[in-house]
Structures are given as C-alpha cells and as structure tokens.
C-alpha cells in the first residue's frame, strides 16, 4: 500500500504517466486530466470495495488547504514528489535506500541490504529505507 499522500504544483501528461507506472490510477475521466495546476496522490479508502491508489488534478487554491502535517507539498519538485508518491509498505520497488550518505533506488521487490552493505561499502552504518524526513531533506534542492 502507498503510505504518503502528497501533491505537486504541476500537472503534465509525462508526470501522470510516471504515476500510472508506479501504480496510481486517475480519479478523473481522461478528458479532464489536464484541468488543475496540481496533482494530488492518495491511497484509496480501504472501506470501499472498488478503492485504489489515485491521483487527481486540483487547482492551486485547493492545494493550499491540505494539512501539511498529513499531505506534503512538494512545490514543483518532481523528484521529491515521485520519491514520496512511491513510498509503500508492501514492496521495495522504486524505494530509496540510504545510510545517510550514499543513496540507491531499488528496482527489486525486496531490497538485498546485505549485498548493498558489502557492494557500496556502507560499513558499520546500516542501509535502510529512507524515511519521509530523509527524502524531503535529500531532494529539497533538486
């Protein structure tokens, strides 16, 4: 399941395609996807039978009302947005791992942390899945 709702203050066909590739579906009809300056991503409502992770176009004014402690405003930073939107608790695919200095994006269902510790010389500092706070800090100036 996706675990971090967030939004970005841009809405392009290329960005929507990247969201589809990581598992999100549009909440809007395809002819309405270009409407709105922001894209919001959320996990669907688990109480609904036909619920799914979705992205939805929004206007900037609407995005200003989200609770920043719950939904992260990525500004126009696409790398941060995609890193946060990819956070899941059921797979390591597209997840960022770090030891605080070295960063690696995982393309495997389950990260091989022992191998990464040896291969990248992470040494005594153990590599781990990056936290939301670490991702925000790492991608803030990208």
Region locations from a protein language model:
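Short, extreme N-terminal segment that most often corresponds to the first beta-strand
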Residues: 1-27
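Charged interaction segments
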Residues: 22, 30-142
């Amino acid at each position: 399941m996706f675990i971090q709702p967030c939004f970005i203050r841009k809405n392009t066909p290329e960005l929507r395609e990247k969201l589809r590739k990581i598992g999100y579906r549009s909440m809007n009809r395809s002819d309405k996807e270009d409407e709105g300056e922001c894209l919001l991503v959320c996990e669907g409502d688990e109480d609904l039978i036909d619920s799914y992770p979705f992205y939805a176009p929004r206007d900037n004014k609407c995005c200003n009302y989200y609770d920043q402690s719950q939904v992260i405003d990525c500004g126009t930073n696409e790398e941060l947005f995609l890193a946060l939107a990819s956070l899941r608790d059921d797979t390591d695919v597209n997840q960022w791992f770090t030891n605080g200095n070295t960063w690696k994006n995982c393309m495997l269902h389950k990260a091989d942390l022992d191998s990464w510790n040896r291969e990248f010389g992470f040494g005594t500092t153990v590599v781990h899945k990056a936290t939301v706070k670490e991702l925000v800090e790492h991608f803030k100036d990208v």
